[in-house]
Amino acid sequence: MSDGDKNGRDNHEEALVPVEVWQELERAECLARGAALKWASGVFCRPEHLEKLGQYKKRESQRTASIQSRLKSVVQSYLEGVDWGLGQLREARAELRGVSHDLYKANLESRKNSEEVTTLETLREISVSHCQLLAAVSNLPRLYKVRSMVLETERLVESRRLLEAHARLMELERWQDEVLLQLQGPRGSSGTELNSEDEELVRNYFSGVGRLVDALAKELWAVVGSGLSLAHQNPTPFVSAVRIVEREEALDQFFLEERRSTSGHNIPMPAGRPRNWRDRFFKVMEEAVSARFRSVSYLHTRGPGLASHLSALQHCIMGDLSTVRHCLEQCVPAHYHLTRAYLHFCHQFLQTHLGLVSGWELEGGEIFAVLNWVLHIYNSSEMMGEPALLAELEIENLGPLISQEGLEQLQNKYVQKVRKSVSEWMQKALEVELTDWQRDQEPDIDHEGYYHTSLPTIITQMLEENARVALMISEALRDQTIQMGLYEMEKLLSRFRDAVIEFGKEHRKDPTVNKFYLHYLLACINNCIILKTSTESLQQQICSFVSNRYSRIPLGPLAALDRAVRKACRLVMDHLLFELQPHLQELLSSTWLDQGDVTLNMCGVLERHCELYNRVRQPCRQRLKEECQWLTVVEYVRAVMQKRLVCRSSDEQKQLAQRMTQDAQQLRDHLQSMEIDGTIGEVNPTALIAALADIINLKDPGMLLLEISGLLSKYPDISEEHVSVLLDIRGDVPKEVRKSVLDFLDQSAPPLPPGYRPIFTEILVPSSSIPFCLPTAKCT
């Protein structure tokens, strides 16, 4: 396009938009005029400022000229740049025309030479065929020797000359690969691929090579598998096997690298490659380890032989480990880390084997053997905790032999088995105890002089022994075992209490059958005290480890012990009452009034019982003596009140009061001689008899209200019925006095003080009936 055309086009475009251009000019001019007007109005705001109009005009003219010159300079440089660019475009167009002309000529020459390429392709095929034939001719001597080399290599394998056999095998494989490559053509060429028939022919001809590989591998893995057994005798075959494995591993890496490279991308991998004999080496070692361990007393792992089996495993592992560390480790490269691999194989086998053993129906001793071996022996310095092994491998990375869930299941199984055994032994011990109660001799006496039987010793030793054995495993298992033992003891004590009750029933049916009934009741109380001490000791062992998950302590055994002791003490008091009853019936008789032998006989019974109570351990000994005193006083007062006698004169009142006072003094003296404190809480039971005697012997009936108020202050549980019986016994109380006394009791009902044990609450007063007089000579 010419410059004139361009100028014409530009002019045409300018003619198309004259309005838009002039609008902008007009707008700019208006803005300029407005700015000038604003500026002038600010400068010439006063007439005297017009004098400087010439100066301002000259300055603005100079500024306008400067701006115009700068604009011209910028436009000129822009035009020069445009002119230079146009020149470069013209030169480039000329060069492109030359290149297009050369390409056209080259295309013409290529079309002329296309017929000659076909001739060259034929020549190339002839050349490839010639090379293959030349290779075949050069390989004929090798091909003739293949069969003889195969036979010779087989003999070497059979005689376990493994290194020589492997060298011959490598040579045969190299010949086979070279023949295949030569038949395929030069490397990197794009010629024809190997014919499948030719490849099959070569494979068949070298078929003996594959058999040699299998035979060599069989012998090789046999040597590796027997390495642990033959290491001390002759490690040479094992060393040869490792060297062959490393050679094969190097060949595998070579072929893999060759196929990864660009030049060997199209070359097929030799048959049977990669062999990965190093991985197979460790696999064979693992199988050999498993086979050796399975042969260690495997047939005798059930029953009592399980502990021996685990011990044999320990000795086998440590013996083989010593062989690996001191013999086989020097026969392999350092990067094999054979000791670490052996530990890993052992750990995997033990995980599987112990998982199988844990699934069996094991007895308590067998479970203990497994837990002790897993938690303590395996990680101890006798096995994997040896410092040299810890430096070689961190056992924690292998994981536990038995999972945490599996351990908990085993521990629960152990506790259940021990529970069954404990329950059976406790039942047998209870049966022996019941048999001992029927013996015609008193119970055994310990070195402290207390009655006892074999029951607490058996129970205590059994529970403590189970806790001690469980602690050898873990504190948690010890706590579980203790809790189980305490629960079983609670069941035993419930049966024990039932047996004591039945023992008492049989004695009440025929008291003459068992002469030592009381003695064995006292022995039962001592047994419970011993069991309580043992129970508290076991509970303290649990309390000393509050953080464990089994921190809940069963309180049932102590409550069961308390119930059993209370029942035995109640039966002891029933037996005392049974022996006192004939003497209590003689109270308020003429013999009692005249001679007083009844009270002496009662004291004799109390002495015999208290002597036996000395065979009881504290605090039950003191409790029995206090109950003995309490029972005697209560029964004495009950006998006085239930017979409802009436004194017909002051002499009779005096006689009755004197006898009661003498009885109270005799009881007090005998009780003190038997080291029984007369005070229970703040009340002296024997003082009650003397207090009742004082009320009966009171001369002035008008003073009864004062005496009754004093009696009420000491014995606040006395009722109107009891006081009414006392007034009836006097026989001389006016109705007004009786009414005032009973009204006073009705209005004064003091609360029972803390620690006060009611007496009159246990004494039931019979309904009113015809009273009888004192047994005087006239009445008789």
Swiss-Prot record:
Give the top-rank taxon of the lineage listed in the UniProt record for this protein. Eukaryota
Under the heading InterPro entries, the entry gives:
EXOC3/Sec6 (IPR010326), EXOC3/Sec6_C (IPR042532)
The record's principal subcellular location, in a coarse class, is cytoplasm
Q: Which Gene3D superfamilies does its entry note?
A: 1.10.357.50, Exocyst complex component Sec6, C-terminal domain
Disulfide pairs here are none
Q: Does the keyword S-adenosyl-L-methionine apply?
A: no
The protein's job, in short, is:
As part of the exocyst, may play a role in regulated exocytosis.
Q: Where are the transmembrane segments?
A: none
One GO cellular component, as annotated: transport vesicle
Q: Which keywords accompany this UniProt record?
A: Cytoplasmic vesicle, Exocytosis
Q: Which family does it belong to?
A: Belongs to the SEC6 family.
Name of this chain's protein: Exocyst complex component 3-like protein
Q: Does the keyword ATP-binding apply?
A: no
> GO molecular function: any one?
SNARE binding
The places in or outside the cell where this protein is found are:
Cytoplasmic vesicle, Secretory vesicle
GO biological process: what's one of them? exocytosis
Organism of origin is Danio rerio (Zebrafish)
